[in-house]
Structure formats: C-alpha cells, structure tokens
C-alpha cells in the first residue's frame, strides 16, 4: 500500500470518526431544538431513512446499497487518479459515515436510519449531518477538479 493510499484511508477514518462523534453527541444531548443563531441555524435531532438532506425518505435499503457500490467504486478509482485525494476522501468519508448508520443503527442491517441534526431555515426545514456536508464538498470539489484538469 502506497503512502498516498495510507493518507487517503487515514483521512477517511478521521472523517468517519468525526461524523460518528457528532451524531453520538446529537443523539445523547439534543432532547429538543437548540438555537445556535436565531432564524439562521439550529440543532434539531432527526432520524432519516432517506439520502442527503432527507431526499428519498423511506428507501434506506436502496441508499445503503448505493453507498456500498459508491465505496467500492471510489476504492477502485483511487489508484487510477493522479489528482488530489482530499475530495475523494471527503466523498468516501461522508458515504461511509452514513452507511455505518444504516448498518448499525435501528432497525439495523441496511435499513437503519441516519442521525441528522443540522438545521437551517434557508434550506426549508431540511435536517442534515456532517457526513452530508462531506459528501456535498466531495462531489463539488471533485467536479471542480475534473473540470479544471480538462
């Protein structure tokens, strides 16, 4: 395994750890909404069986399967790319964090619900988590990187 690959998986591991710690803290301490910035940002505990930003609620098993496929694809793609691994690590870490929830959170094994807790009225009541932000940053960054390399 190359140093680059080790760095990639170390970053992915750190991102998954960060995601799981924030979800644990939200689940343990958010009994009710906590307003961080009035009318702009609050912490709201929610369970989500859909994808990022509550899209596709009720299809947890499908997003679990798509997550596994994406993790395998990124793992396959990593050695074939010469670009920055940061965006791929953000993508991999975010997907892995949410796949972990679907696997190990009730009702378990592919049907689990993802813990969401970040809420802003700017997104019309959508509640999301750190992993969703990692995924969004990874997709956006990868797109910009690929566009810039052409």
From Swiss-Prot:
Top enzyme category: hydrolase
Provide this UniProt record's keywords sorted from A to Z: Aspartyl protease, Cell membrane, Hydrolase, Membrane, Protease, Transmembrane, Transmembrane helix
- What's a single GO MF annotation on this record? aspartic-type endopeptidase activity
GO cellular component: a single term = plasma membrane
Pfam families noted in UniProt = Peptidase_A8 (PF01252)
Q: Does the keyword Acetylation apply?
A: no
Q: What does this protein do?
A: This protein specifically catalyzes the removal of signal peptides from prolipoproteins.
| Protein name (Swiss-Prot/TrEMBL) | Lipoprotein signal peptidase
This chain's source organism reads Tropheryma whipplei (strain Twist) (Whipple's bacillus)
Name of the coding gene:
lspA
């Amino acid at each position: 395994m190359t140093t680059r690959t080790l760095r990639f998986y170390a970053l992915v591991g750190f991102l998954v750890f960060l995601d799981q710690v924030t979800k644990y803290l939200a689940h343990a301490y958010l009994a009710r909404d906590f307003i961080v910035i009035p009318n702009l940002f609050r912490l709201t505990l929610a369970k989500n069986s859909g994808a990022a930003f509550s899209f596709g609620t009720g299809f947890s098993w499908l997003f679990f399967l798509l997550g596994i496929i994406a993790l395998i694809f990124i793992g396959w793609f990593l050695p074939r790319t010469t670009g920055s691994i940061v965006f791929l690590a953000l993508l991999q870490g975010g997907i892995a964090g949410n796949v972990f929830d679907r696997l190990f959170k009730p009702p378990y094994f592919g049907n689990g619900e993802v813990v969401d807790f970040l809420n802003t009225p700017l997104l019309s009541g959508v509640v999301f988590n750190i992993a969703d932000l990692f995924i969004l940053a990874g997709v956006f960054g990868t797109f910009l990187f690929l566009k810039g390399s052409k």
